[in-house]
Amino acid sequence: MTETLHIVGGGMAGSEAAWQAAQMGVSVVIHEMRPKVGTFAHKTGHLAEMVCSNSFRSDDDEQNAVGLLHWEMRAAGGLIMEMADAHALPAGGALAVDREPFAESVTARLHEHPNIRVEGTEITSLPAEGKWIIATGPLTSGALAEAIAAETGQESLAFFDAIAPILYFDSIDMTKAWMQSRYDKGETEEERTAYLNCPMDRDQYEAFIDALLAAEKTEFKPGETAGYFDGCLPIEVMAERGRETLRHGPMKPVGLTNPHQPDVKAHAVVQLRRDNALGTLYNIVGFQTKMKYGAQKEVLRMIPGLEEARFARLGGIHRNTFINAPTLLDDQMRLHSRPNLRFAGQITGVEGYVESAAMGLLAGRMAAAEILGTPLASPPQETAMGALIHHITGGAEAKTFQPMNVNFGLFPPLDGVRGGRRGRKERYKGYTDRAKAAWQGWLGQTALAAE
């Protein structure tokens, strides 16, 4: 008799992990505290309840990274995608879901599976023995959150987090921006050019501050705390404290020389920092924001060099429990200090329903393969799944790690494909064609593991 796999949390990730492992012949127990113990966001005791929007975003598997993730999950027999397709609503090129029947159907399928048992229990500590997947999401209960913090180090668990925007490097106008660290600090050329700089003159700065103060902001939701962490003040809050505050904070112009206009001293400078090992994504340093998405794009595109910016992720501030996965997890999503424990879903630092379910799919398959004595390698980075797991388990910068949606900036570059806006369609098709072939190859290895 094979070892039982225990899964804590019956959200998107936990539900998908359970399904994948059970389909491989492994006995699974899902520990879901709801409805006995509720949260301020959940309304039912159903598994895979959608508490935010009802959108799985774009379903285009040729030109969109999340659409590719849909394709990979469907190819892997994913329960979440099967039920989303069964309860899809008209939404153009997106996949929107009728959330209540969706959750009811996922719950029914899991309860009906002969290899799955669902227990309405709250897990309040990290188990010392057995194979476990922790998939408790951003609303992890207090006792378990404390146990995770004690095991990983308090600084590894964020309870309320600020997010700065991330954009694609190839959308930045380098005739206006330049690469330089303040005062040319660093021992290597890479260190001395670690930051990308966008200069503003006085008029541009004043117009930017006016737009920032006037922009529509998102208010805190009920149940969220309105306090800010030190060092994570939203830029609009700083601007409200004085028009010069940003110019003496994240936008200070000191220690920098614009090679495009070496004799002109900038009034303010916006800095961007590389956000992934590939150098395809950059985040705007110190630009945590509560501006609504539409206003955010409009205001940030006022920055010289970012007029045509394309965003991989927009900024925001919200409650989010997640671990610093790049320092804590191996490429099997196991905790370095406790290899019997895997983490999956939003708690690992992925953002979104689909990404959470995708990490559950991988965790379930890897855990099941390990139990069956045929361990699986992580999927290739060329796949959407592989790009995500690589990002959260080592590709991202640990010091600035923040939740991330899947996007093509996480994928290794293609050879011989034109860059920039004009080559985008060909480039994205190249990414998705390459990913599909690599994913099919990895699924073949998984099938052998289950035999």
Swiss-Prot record:
InterPro entries: FAD/NAD-bd_sf (IPR036188), MnmG-rel (IPR002218), MnmG-rel_CS (IPR020595), MnmG_N (IPR040131), TrmFO (IPR004417). GO terms for cellular component: cytosol. Keywords: Cytoplasm, FAD, Flavoprotein, Methyltransferase, NAD, NADP, Transferase, tRNA processing. It comes from the Bacteria. It is an enzyme of class 2 (transferase). Its main location: cytoplasm. Its EC number is 2.1.1.74. GO terms for molecular function: flavin adenine dinucleotide binding; tRNA (uracil(54)-C5)-methyltransferase activity, 5,10-methylenetetrahydrofolate-dependent. It is found in: Cytoplasm. Its cofactor is FAD. It catalyses: uridine(54) in tRNA + (6R)-5,10-methylene-5,6,7,8-tetrahydrofolate + NADH + H(+) = 5-methyluridine(54) in tRNA + (6S)-5,6,7,8-tetrahydrofolate + NAD(+); uridine(54) in tRNA + (6R)-5,10-methylene-5,6,7,8-tetrahydrofolate + NADPH + H(+) = 5-methyluridine(54) in tRNA + (6S)-5,6,7,8-tetrahydrofolate + NADP(+). FAD binds at G9, G10, G11, M12, A13, G14. GO terms for biological process: tRNA methylation; tRNA wobble uridine modification. The keyword Repeat does not apply. Signal peptide: none annotated. Catalyzes the folate-dependent formation of 5-methyl-uridine at position 54 (M-5-U54) in all tRNAs. Belongs to the MnmG family. TrmFO subfamily. This is Methylenetetrahydrofolate--tRNA-(uracil-5-)-methyltransferase TrmFO.
